[in-house]
Design a protein with these regions (language model features):
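N-terminal hydrophobic targeting signals that begin at the initiator methionine
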Residues: 1-3
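Sec-dependent N-terminal signal peptides
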Residues: 5-15
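Subset of outer-membrane beta-barrel
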Residues: 22-327
């Protein structure tokens, strides 16, 4: 049996990832870009929605998880959809409201995502394409169904692994990775439903449905993807003519771990300037702020204050999002 003094940081990280199941990136600002957790949310807005973002989790912790991504989504044949939204190139000196959500008509949407997720010596790159169909249930409510297909590359970076203390004890998992046998490509399928109107939403999505059934590459190390479920919901409520509040939730589940529950409250001023707070059960308290910089650009920042056992080692987490709205 290995003693703590013989275990390297990378083995600790591997064990931690297996236990905590952080196989999928975590997004504090999920409420502002639900497309990243549900392909059914592709094309909700009638313009080309481009997002680039970066996230540093557990700042101050050596080899902490880092995530960066870019996404783009758009309805097909957008020119046939009439919208009051008409973004310009200039920066705005006044209030720029959120674009409207149009319901009551059939539409199709496509999108793509590129995600780079790294934690310690482990790196995951994934390129994904999505398609969604939006069905009008009534004039005010739509139900969309989205699918995704992606290719993920899971790599063990041998040069980033450092052994804390030498040991003669044989550990097959550790030996397999440090022999540079960790480069596997895995096909990923996902799907999701998204019910929405101008003021409310409810979604359910599943990711990594194929697990590791379809894989290829030069490695023999065992990357073991698990099916992930995401359930989201929220409703926008007016407080007065200038303020709205949106209570929302995100539930994440991966067998056999316990569900992760996140509750969020977003306060928005004239659909232009917003702030939000989230509580991630036994993990973090999150503060967020953002605004529409102009008719074309939007910005969001969040800070995670850890309340887990890692709070004494980490100064928190940071996430920055820049959105570009193209008409």
């Amino acid at each position: 049996m290995l003693k703590n003094k013989y275990i390297s940081f990378i083995v600790l990280l591997l064990m931690f990832c297996d236990v905590k199941a952080q196989q999928m990136p975590q997004y504090s600002q999920y409420l502002r870009n639900q497309y990243m957790i549900n392909p059914g949310a592709a094309g909700v807005y009638d313009f080309v929605d481009v997002t680039v973002a970066g996230r540093l989790q557990w700042a101050g912790f050596s080899e902490a998880p880092m995530t960066s991504y870019a996404s783009v989504t758009s309805p097909i044949l957008r020119g046939k959809n009439k919208s009051v939204y008409n973004p310009g190139l200039h920066m705005s000196s006044g209030i720029v409201k959120n674009p409207e959500i149009n319901t009551g008509k059939l539409k199709h949407a496509v999108g793509g995502q590129l995600v780079a997720d790294q934690y310690g010596a482990f790196r995951k790159l994934q390129l994904t394409g999505t398609y969604a169909i939006h069905l009008p249930l009534t004039k005010d409510y739509n139900l969309s169904f989205g699918t995704k297909i992606g290719l993920g590359n899971n790599t063990f970076l041998q040069d980033r692994a450092v052994v804390a203390n030498a040991t003669t004890v044989v550990d097959n998992t550790y030996t397999g990775f440090t022999n540079n046998q960790g480069n596997i490509n895995i096909l990923n399928l996902g799907a999701g439903f998204y019910f929405y109107s101008k003021t409310l939403f409810l979604g359910i999505a599943a990711d990594q449905l194929t697990k590791n059934f379809i894989k290829f590459g030069s490695g023999t190390a065992n990357f073991d993807p698990k099916i992930h479920m995401n359930v989201t919901g929220g409703i926008k409520l007016p407080l007065n003519e200038n303020l709205t509040i949106t209570p929302a939730f995100l539930v994440k589940y991966m067998n056999p771990t316990k569900p992760s529950i996140e509750a969020t409250a977003q306060l928005e001023y004239k659909e232009w300037l917003w702030t939000a707070f989230s509580y991630r059960h036994k993990d973090a308290v999150v503060g967020m702020v953002g605004m529409n910089i102009s008719n074309r650009f939007k910005f969001g920042y969040s800070y995670d204050f850890s309340i887990s056992q890692f709070r004494t080692y980490s100064s928190g987490g940071h996430e920055i999002i820049l959105g570009i709205m193209l008409r």
